[in-house]
């Protein structure tokens, strides 16, 4: 009986405090909103952010391969979805040479000139081993590149390297602000013409 009495007493003492607690919570919420906060929990929003940032690697590969097929304007249009307007993009080649451009239009022209100059008729960029670290509206991302550049039916150039990206969230969208490609290999693979053809079973 004494225990129940103490419980009732504790509850009765707590009830008058509820208005004060409610006011405190309301004040905290108002301050949070005024400071530009959202009600998304960090644990819930980070996976979404990482997924959106990872999609930027796909965006870039699709844009580059559009240029590889000869459609330079389509590639540039795709690039605009991947990068900020003032993005800086750098390629560092295995021999130590490098090229840096600002803006997707300039970078698209550079990519097109490299592809045309080497006689590529198609390209395929595969991206993997993606690592992302998000901090507020900024993020860093690294990813591995394996790219095939087709010269002819018997000759391809293969590039391998690492992309290092600085990513920023602008107007609710993640975009790459700075990208550096560090190539470790750029090799030509060729084979003599062959009469062997891929065998495809008939139905």
What residue ranges belong to the model's regions?
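A solvent-exposed, acidic/Ser-Thr-rich amphipathic alpha-helical stretch
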Residues: 75-144
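Bacterial N-terminal signal peptides
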Residues: 23-37
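Active-site micro-motifs of SAM-dependent methyltransferase domains
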Residues: 62, 85, 89, 169, ...
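General structural signal for alpha-helix termini and helix-helix connectors
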Residues: 62, 66-69, 92-93, 117, ...
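Short, low-complexity N-terminal intrinsically disordered segments enriched in polar/charged residues
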Residues: 38-85
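N-terminal secretory signal peptides that target proteins for export/translocation
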Residues: 1-17
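A beta-strand edge to alpha-helix "cap/lid" segment located at domain peripheries
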Residues: 45, 116-203
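Short, hydrophobic alpha-helical membrane anchors of single-pass surface/secreted proteins
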Residues: 17-23
